[in-house]
Amino acid sequence: VLIPRPDTEILVEEVMKLYSNEQKLSVLDIGTGSGCIIISILKDRPKFNGIAIDISKKAINIAKYNAKMHHLNNRIKFYKTSVDNFFKDKYDLIVSNPPYISRLQIKYLDKDILGFEPIQALEGGIDGFNVYSKIVKKSSMLLKVGGKLVLEIGFDQKFKMLKLLKKHVFV
């Protein structure tokens, strides 16, 4: 399971700016890992409910435990599945911090990161966009009209992400 970092806090803060405490929304967290994103969002927005998915059974179990510790287990449902195979409902908000480090950059990561986190939670394929491509494509089917997609991306991935979003009519 990926260890949350300050960049992920920024993702959560940006979501908080988009929605008020009074709104009632459905949230989908793709690649939930420890559950830190959806748990942080739901803890701050009491009228939100969520679904969290991950391909790792271990990650799902950790996320369930964390949700229970924060008294949110009745507001989050967890599924062990990939984004490719997920077709349940439509959502107001989709969030994700997927693996986005390119295969070439992985070898340059700090040993502290590589020694404690599964490569599956870090590497996003040859160009870092394997999972992004799946998420963006699927989000066009899973978002309600007017829904939002909020993703954490790498420092050098902005223009490639904009191109991908345009391809799937997000911008």
Language-model-derived ranges and their functions:
Residues Y100-V131:
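Mobile active-site "lid"/loop adjacent to the S-adenosyl-L-methionine
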Residues I126-V171:
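Conserved Class I SAM-dependent methyltransferase catalytic core
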Residues I3:
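Glycine/small-residue-rich loop that forms an oxyanion/phosphate-binding "nest" at active or ligand-binding sites
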Residues V15, I41, I113, I135-S139:
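Class I S-adenosylmethionine-dependent transferase superfamily signal
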Residues D7-Y108:
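Conserved SAM/SAH cofactor-binding pocket of Class I
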